[in-house]
C-alpha cells in the first residue's frame, strides 16, 4: 500500500473494518407487513374509524429530496416502489395526499428546509412520512415526534410505511440490515425506481464510511462501510443500459473506500463496469476521500483516461491546514492531497479535480485560512464547494470553542471572491469537443451536456440531441460553463439500442406502450378498491350511529 506523504500517525485504514469473511451476502427480502404503533385511546372516534378504513395504494404522493446523489438514488427507489404499489407520484405538492420528505443532515440550512416542509405539510393537513439522514440520526427530535419514518437502510419497505401513514398510524423503521451479524449494503439494487432523469442512472456502490470526522452528522445516519458485491453492481449497470440510460453515476459517502469490507477495491469494480459501458455512454465516479484513493493512483489514472469514463474526480480537502485537518480527524495531511492532485494532473491531462472547503472550523486561525487560500490560488479549481461551518448537534465539533459568526462569514466571502476571480474555461475558446447531452438547462433555453472532463457545455435545444454524443465548437466561455455550436457534418452517436424510459416510468417494471405514473394498478383492481373503500366508509358511519 502506498504510504501517506505526511508523517501524521493514524490507524491503519484496513484495521478499521473486519475482513475475515469476505463472502458477499444476499440482501434480505422485504417483510410483508409492518406493525403500527399502538394507539393509547380507549375509544376510537368516528373520524379515526374512517381513517382506519381507508384503502391505501390509490393516493397521490409528493416526494421531496434534499442533499447528495446517494439521497437522490434512495428517493428514486422509493418513488418506483410506491408507483408499482398503485400510488401516483405527483410533482404538485398541493395536490398530494401524502408528503414523503427525504432529508439531508450535512448542513444546518438543509435541515431547516426539511423542518419548514414538515410544518407546511401539517398546516395543509397532509399525511407525512420522513426519510433520509435527519430522522435516522435523530429520531427523537421534538419536531418529528409521532411522525412516520423510513430509515436509510429500510427504503425497500417504504410502501409498508406509507400504507400505514395513509391509514393514520405512526410507523418507524430505523434498523440496519444484517445477515449472520454482518452489515449489508442496504436495499436490493434491483428494486423498481423512477429516475428523475431517464438518461442518468445513479448507483450507490456502498453505504456508510470508514471515517469519524468530528463535524459529520451523516456518519450517525449511514454508519460504517458496507459495500454491494461487484456482480450486483455489474447487473444493475447492464439493466440500466437496457433501459436507454446513457450516463452512470457511481455514488456513496466515500467511493474510494469501496470493497474494503468484502475483500475487493474500487479499481476492481471500475474495470468490471467499464466492460459494460457501450460506445456513446459515459461513467462518472463520485466523491472519494484522499486516504482511500492514494494507494490506487496508478490504476485510477488509467481508468480516468478511458474514453468512456469522465476524467473527473471529486476529492474533498476541507482545509489546507494540517492542524485543522487533525482537529477534523480527516486522516490525511495537505501534502497527501497535493500529491494526489499533482499525480493525476500529470498522468490524466485535462482532468477536472473538484474539492470542498469548510470555512471557520473551530480553532481555525488566520494563518490556517491563508494556507487554504494559497492552495486554491495554486490549483484554481474549476469546481469548488464552499461551506461555512455549522456545528451539527451530537458531533464532537459542536462541543469545540466556536469562532465568531462574523469571522466565519467573512472567510466564506473571501474564499468565494477568490473562486470567482478566475475563469477556468477561457483558454478553451474555439476548441472542438465531443459532449454527451443529458438534460435541459434550468432556464429551459438550452440542453446541458458534458465533455470528457465533465465540464458543462450548453448546446442548442434540439430534440435530436438529447441522449446523444454531439461534436461542438466552443464559441463562448463563462465561469461555470461553455457554449458549444454543433458541427453539422459530424454524426450524432447514441449509446442505447432501445428508447429511454419515459419520464415517470418505472425502471425494472416496464409495460408495453405509454405508461403513465398512475397506470401500475389494473383497472379492475382500481374499481374493486373504490367499491371496498365506499363500503368501509358506510360501515364506519353505521357503527358510529349504533354506538
Swiss-Prot record:
Protein name, entry field: Threonylcarbamoyladenosine tRNA methylthiotransferase
Residues in TRAM domain copies: 426-488
Stretches that traverse the bilayer: 527-547
Substrates-to-products reaction catalysed: N(6)-L-threonylcarbamoyladenosine(37) in tRNA + (sulfur carrier)-SH + AH2 + 2 S-adenosyl-L-methionine = 2-methylsulfanyl-N(6)-L-threonylcarbamoyladenosine(37) in tRNA + (sulfur carrier)-H + 5'-deoxyadenosine + L-methionine + A + S-adenosyl-L-homocysteine + 2 H(+)
Key words, A-Z: 4Fe-4S, Endoplasmic reticulum, Iron, Iron-sulfur, Membrane, Metal-binding, S-adenosyl-L-methionine, Transferase, Transmembrane, Transmembrane helix, tRNA processing
Record's function text: Catalyzes the methylthiolation of N6-threonylcarbamoyladenosine (t(6)A), leading to the formation of 2-methylthio-N6-threonylcarbamoyladenosine (ms(2)t(6)A) at position 37 in tRNAs that read codons beginning with adenine.
Domain Radical SAM core: 195-426
Entry's localization field: Endoplasmic reticulum membrane
GO biological process: endocrine pancreas development; pancreas regeneration; tRNA methylthiolation; type B pancreatic cell development
Single Gene Ontology MF annotation: 4 iron, 4 sulfur cluster binding
EC class name: transferase
Domain of life of the organism encoding this protein: Eukaryota
Name of the coding gene: cdkal1
Amino acid at each position: 500500500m502506498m504510504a501517506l506523504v505526511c508523517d501524521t500517525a493514524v490507524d491503519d485504514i484496513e484495521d478499521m473494518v473486519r475482513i475475515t469473511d469476505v463472502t458477499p451476502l444476499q440482501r434480505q427480502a422485504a417483510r410483508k407487513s409492518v406493525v403500527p404503533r399502538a394507539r393509547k385511546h380507549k375509544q376510537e372516534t368516528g373520524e379515526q374509524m374512517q381513517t382506519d378504513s381507508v384503502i391505501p395504494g390509490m393516493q397521490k404522493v409528493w416526494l421531496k429530496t434534499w442533499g447528495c446523489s446517494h439521497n437522490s438514488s434512495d428517493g428514486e427507489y422509493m418513488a418506483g416502489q410506491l408507483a408499482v404499489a398503485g400510488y401516483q407520484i405527483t410533482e404538485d405538492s398541493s395536490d398530494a395526499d401524502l408528503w414523503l420528505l427525504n432529508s439531508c443532515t450535512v448542513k444546518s440550512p438543509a435541515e431547516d428546509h426539511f423542518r419548514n416542509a414538515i410544518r407546511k405539510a401539517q398546516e395543509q393537513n397532509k399525511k407525512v412520512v420522513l426519510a433520509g439522514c435527519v430522522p435516522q440520526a435523530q429520531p427523537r427530535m421534538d419536531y418529528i415526534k409521532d411522525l412516520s419514518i423510513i430509515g436509510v437502510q429500510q427504503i425497500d419497505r417504504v410502501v409498508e410505511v406509507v400504507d400505514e401513514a395513509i391509514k393514520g398510524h405512526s410507523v418507524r423503521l430505523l434498523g440496519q440490515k444484517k445477515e449472520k451479524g454482518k452489515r449489508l449494503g442496504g436495499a436490493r439494487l434491483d428494486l423498481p425506481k423512477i429516475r428523475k432523469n431517464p438518461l442518468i442512472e445513479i448507483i450507490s456502490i456502498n453505504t456508510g464510511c470508514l471515517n469519524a470526522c468530528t463535524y459529520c452528522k451523516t456518519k450517525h445516519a449511514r454508519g460504517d462501510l458496507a459495500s454491494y458485491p461487484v456482480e450486483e453492481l455489474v447487473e444493475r449497470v447492464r439493466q440500466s443500459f437496457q433501459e436507454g440510460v446513457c450516463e452512470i453515476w457511481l455514488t456513496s459517502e466515500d467511493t474510494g473506500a469501496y470493497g474494503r469490507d468484502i475483500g475487493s477495491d474500487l479499481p476492481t469494480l471500475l474495470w468490471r463496469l467499464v466492460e459494460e459501458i457501450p460506445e456513446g455512454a459515459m461513467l462518472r465516479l463520485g466523491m472519494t476521500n484522499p486516504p482511500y484513493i492514494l494507494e490506487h493512483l496508478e490504476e485510477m489514472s488509467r481508468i480516468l483516461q478511458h474514453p468512456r469514463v469522465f476524467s473527473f474526480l471529486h476529492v474533498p480537502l476541507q482545509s489546507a491546514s494540517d492542524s485543522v485537518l487533525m482537529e477534523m480527524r480527516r486522516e490525511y495531511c495537505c501534502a497527501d492531497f497535493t500529491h494526489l492532485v499533482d499525480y493525476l494532473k500529470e498522468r490524466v491531462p485535462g482532468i477536472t479535480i473538484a474539492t470542498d472547503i469548510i470555512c471557520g472550523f473551530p480553532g481555525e486561525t488566520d494563518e490556517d485560512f491563508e494556507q487554504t487560500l494559497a492552495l486554491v490560488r495554486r490549483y484554481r479549481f474549476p469546481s469548488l464547494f464552499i461551506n461555512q461551518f455549522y456545528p451539527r448537534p451530537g458531533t464532537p465539533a459542536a462541543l469545540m470553542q466556536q469562532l465568531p459568526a462574523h469571522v466565519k462569514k467573512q472567510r466564506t466571502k473571501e474564499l468565494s471572491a477568490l473562486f470567482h476571480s478566475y475563469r477556468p474555461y477561457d483558454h478553451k475558446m474555439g476548441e472542438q469537443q465531443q459532449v454527451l447531452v443529458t438534460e435541459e438547462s434550468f432556464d429551459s433555453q438550452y440542453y446541458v451536456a458534458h465533455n470528457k472532463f465533465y465540464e458543462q457545455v450548453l448546446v442548442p435545444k434540439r430534440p435530436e440531441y438529447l441522449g446523444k454524443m454531439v461534436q461542438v465548437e466552443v464559441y463562448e466561455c463563462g465561469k461555470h460553463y461553455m457554449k458549444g455550436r454543433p458541427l453539422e457534418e459530424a454524426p450524432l452517436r447514441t449509446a442505447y439500442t432501445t428508447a429511454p424510459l419515459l419520464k415517470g416510468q418505472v425502471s425494472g417494471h416496464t409495460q408495453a406502450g405509454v405508461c403513465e405514473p398512475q397506470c401500475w394498478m389494473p383497472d379492475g383492481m382500481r374499481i374493486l378498491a373504490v367499491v371496498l373503500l365506499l363500503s368501509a366508509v358506510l360501515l364506519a358511519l353505521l357503527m358510529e350511529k349504533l354506538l
